[in-house]
Design a protein with these regions (language model features):
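Domain-level recognition of soluble alpha/beta enzyme cores
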Residues: 62-122, 314
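Short substrate-entry loop that stabilizes the transition state in hydrolases
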Residues: 109-117, 122, 126-158, 294-297
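Alpha/beta-hydrolase active-site loop
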Residues: 163-188, 209, 221, 225-232, ...
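Short glycine-enriched nucleophile-adjacent loop
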Residues: 181, 204-216
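Alpha/beta-hydrolase fold nucleophile elbow
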Residues: 188-199
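Acidic catalytic loop of the alpha/beta-hydrolase fold
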Residues: 270-271, 292-296, 324
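Short beta-strand/loop motif that positions the catalytic acidic residue
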Residues: 281, 287-289
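Short alpha-helix in the alpha/beta-hydrolase fold that links the catalytic acid
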Residues: 297-306, 330
Length: 371
């Protein structure tokens, strides 16, 4: 039995108070026509009924925030336009949508919800796509972030013509930021002082470069002579011009000072960074390492970055995780298409890990990009 809420006191204090009110009205000469003590009693009771109706009426809950979604192209100077997937907070109702081999719970074309929103640009790894980290992007959007996930020209699932040309990537990040702040239809919802970057593998190298990290590219050739089987060295070896020519053609990118925080997961070419090249980074960094990463194995990738970055550092190591466990959990269709990207160590639960991973990424950016 539900407890009864009593908004109608009927004790002696109430009776006395109402009788006194009636006497005052009578003495003041207002007891004329329908304004009688009984009318006042009914008036007071009506007021109490109105108050109780307000108190007992259900409060309309705020609409749950879903992930809105759209795609666009961002100009990149004389190069081909960049393909970008945008995720953002919306109050529209989401639906499960099939996008290629992925299933996303999104509200396509929903109105942007909120003002002063932070912007996160996602940089995928070698051969990746705009949807490689769609789970993390959706989690960020549901938490009130605008997310722009770029497909890097020449280094994506459909085009590997510039797979080893790492120095184009930071420029792509800057061009996407330019577009989001000046051209995107929802640009007025973004706070331009709250911009971060998320990167995995080659995207993590990109994130370090865009916040001021300077790679010593001269370290590539000797490292690859000693470890030709490392995945980055295999990429370099496939370049027609050879390692020396490729490195000579690379130009160090400029730092983009608009980027105020970075999440860096399993960074490629970590051995090219030193304390001198990373020590000047002044923005908060969250660094992730997969314990069972055989693509970028220790101690040549995450470890040099961890040692060189300024302290304190938000460093996370994931037990039993592999390099590709930072990618969104796979659908059965995608697992059949790309088994290496979807295979985890025995006993590792990628879905459960991503609940923790996404929460940690959201929490980091909330603090690092606090207005």
């Amino acid at each position: 039995m539900q407890p009864q809420l009593n908004f109608y006191p009927s004790g002696p204090e109430t009776t006395t108070a109402m009788t006194g009110l009636e006497r005052q009205i009578t003495r003041s000469g207002l007891k004329q026509g329908f304004i009688t003590p009984s009318f006042i009693s009914r008036l007071v009771c009506s007021a109490l009924l109105c108050i109780s109706a307000v108190l007992l009426s259900p409060v309309k809950a705020a609409a749950p925030i879903a992930a809105g979604f759209e795609t666009l192209q961002a100009a990149d100077g004389t190069d081909k336009p960049l393909e970008v997937a945008i995720f953002y907070p919306t109050e529209a109702v989401p639906q499960e949508v099939d996008l290629g081999p992925f299933k996303l719970n999104i509200a396509r074309g929903g109105a942007v919800a909120g003002q002063g929103l932070p912007l996160i640009v996602i940089s995928h790894g070698n051969g990746g796509a705009t949807l490689s980290h769609h789970g993390t992007a959706i989690a960020l959007a549901q938490a009130g972030f605008v997310v722009a996930a770029v497909a890097h020209t020449g280094d994506n699932h459909a085009d590997q013509s510039r797979a080893a040309s790492m120095m184009d990537r930071p420029r792509h990040i800057s061009r996407v930021i330019d577009h989001m702040l000046t051209q995107w239809s929802g640009k007025d919802h973004i706070n331009a002082t709250r911009i971060g970057v998320f990167g995995h593998s080659s995207g993590a190298f990109t994130a370090l470069a865009i916040v001021g990290g300077t790679a010593d590219l001269g370290r590539i050739a000797p490292h690859c002579q000693q470890r030709p089987g490392d995945y980055p060295c295999q990429l370099v070896a496939r370049q027609p011009a050879g390692t020396a020519a490729m490195v000579a053609a690379m130009v160090q990118p400029d730092r983009d000072t608009r980027v105020r925080a970075a999440v860096v997961a399993a960074p490629a070419l970590g051995f090219t960074f030193t304390q001198a090249s990373l020590g000047a980074i002044s923005v908060p960094i969250q660094l992730w390492r997969a314990e069972q990463d055989v693509v970028l194995p220790q101690p040549w990738y995450v470890e040099p970055v961890r040692a060189a970055l300024p302290k304190p550092l938000d460093y996370r190591e994931v037990p039993n995780a592999g390099h590709f466990d930072f990618l969104a959990p796979c659908t059965p269709r995608f697992a059949a298409m790309a088994p290496p990207l979807c295979s985890s160590q025995p006993g590792f639960d990628r879905v459960a890990f991503h609940r923790e991973f996404n929460a940690a990424v959201v929490g980091f950016f909330r603090v690092a990009l606090k207005p």
